[in-house]
Amino acid sequence: MVGINVKQPEKECHDPNCPFHGELSVRGQVIEGTVTSDKADRTITVERSFYKYINKFERYEKRNSKIKAHKPDCLDVKVGDSVKIAECRQLSKTKHFVLVEVKEGE
């Protein structure tokens, strides 16, 4: 994939919304997170944690955000896996990201 250092999956798929075997182009943010749900069809929920600075208290607070992402057929993922998702065009009302890599050994 151009611009993102991820390896090509071994499995082949015929999903038109696959960034590897379909016609979906990725651009914008690349986010790492943990899969919290994979119950929906071809959709995963990824949770990421980040720190937000609070001026009044001069300290950081920990925040979480949940992002829905498209899961192509060529990538296998389960709850608890560490993944990398990339921004793409809007695929549904809530999906703007697509799964591009499953981290090994985590």
UniProtKB/Swiss-Prot annotation:
One of its GO terms (cellular component) is cytosolic small ribosomal subunit. GO terms for biological process: translation. It comes from Methanosphaera stadtmanae (strain ATCC 43021 / DSM 3091 / JCM 11832 / MCB-3). GO terms for molecular function: rRNA binding; structural constituent of ribosome. Keywords: Ribonucleoprotein, Ribosomal protein, RNA-binding, rRNA-binding. Pfam families: Ribosomal_S17 (PF00366). NCBIfam families: PRK08572.1, uS17_arch. Part of the 30S ribosomal subunit. InterPro entries: NA-bd_OB-fold (IPR012340), Ribosomal_uS17 (IPR000266), Ribosomal_uS17_arc/euk (IPR028333), Ribosomal_uS17_archaeal (IPR019978). This is Small ribosomal subunit protein uS17. Belongs to the universal ribosomal protein uS17 family. One of the primary rRNA binding proteins, it binds specifically to the 5'-end of 16S ribosomal RNA.
